[in-house]
Amino acid sequence: MDTQALSDLAAHIEGRMPDAVRSWQIHVGELTLLAERDHIVPLLRFLRDDQQCNFETFIDVCGVDYPERSERFEVVYHLLSMRMNHRIRVRIRTDEETAVPSVVSLWPAANWFEREAFDMYGIQFADHPDLRRILTDYGFEGWPLRKDFPLTGHYEVRYDDLEKRVIYEPVKLAQEYRNFDFLSPWEGMTTVIPGDEKAKEG
């Protein structure tokens, strides 16, 4: 779709769902809505059922972490209209305590995507039929895609041949983290940096 058609679509959505849409923008040929968290289910139902929108195909829902914000998480929904041949991205914001309404009632395929966002970020989804971890182990501590999660994690999980079972141990680093100097010509940089002009002459 061209920019004008996307602008017309955004105006149509905003006109029909004024309480749900906070703002919208067109970037790289795709329409993105910033929506109110508590209106996400009615908004997505409208996007699916309205004949001008017809976003019947649910593609994805994922989380994004912005730890500097008071509402640190964004939940991002991607929808596709195969009949109209266009896509839309819908973003909502939430904090660590406030649950986001689940959209499993609209698209059952959202089930595992919401579980993944819960497992990786700790984002809560209200009225989800089975909100439990899906990728990490049962006793896993923390939320691994949060930007404040330690790079090494908390525990090392390995199979022990002597005990014939999986064991958990605190992480032990064999060496300290390396601090790479990306401005050093010895680290593979091909451009000349100030003061290094003689290196090219020799």
UniProtKB/Swiss-Prot annotation:
How does the record say this protein sits in the membrane? Answer: Peripheral membrane protein
Q: Name one Pfam family in it.
A: Complex1_30kDa
Look at the named UniProt entry and state the broad enzyme category this protein falls under.
Answer: translocase
Report the subcellular localization: Cell inner membrane
UniProt main location, coarse: membrane
In the UniProt record, which is one GO cellular component term?
plasma membrane
What reaction does this catalyse? a quinone + NADH + 5 H(+)(in) = a quinol + NAD(+) + 4 H(+)(out)
- EC number annotated for this UniProt entry: 7.1.1.-
Q: Which GO terms describe its molecular function?
A: NADH dehydrogenase (ubiquinone) activity; NADH:ubiquinone reductase (non-electrogenic) activity; quinone binding
Q: Which UniProt keywords apply?
A: Cell inner membrane, Cell membrane, Membrane, NAD, Quinone, Translocase, Transport, Ubiquinone
User: What quaternary arrangement does the UniProt entry report?
Assistant: NDH-1 is composed of 14 different subunits. Subunits NuoB, C, D, E, F, and G constitute the peripheral sector of the complex.
User: What function does the entry list?
Assistant: NDH-1 shuttles electrons from NADH, via FMN and iron-sulfur (Fe-S) centers, to quinones in the respiratory chain. The immediate electron acceptor for the enzyme in this species is believed to be ubiquinone. Couples the redox reaction to proton translocation (for every two electrons transferred, four hydrogen ions are translocated across the cytoplasmic membrane), and thus conserves the redox energy in a proton gradient.
Q: Which family does it belong to?
A: Belongs to the complex I 30 kDa subunit family.
Q: What protein name applies here? A: NADH-quinone oxidoreductase subunit C
Task: Provide the species name.
Answer: Hyphomonas neptunium (strain ATCC 15444)
The root-end lineage is: Bacteria, Pseudomonadati, Pseudomonadota, Alphaproteobacteria, Hyphomonadales
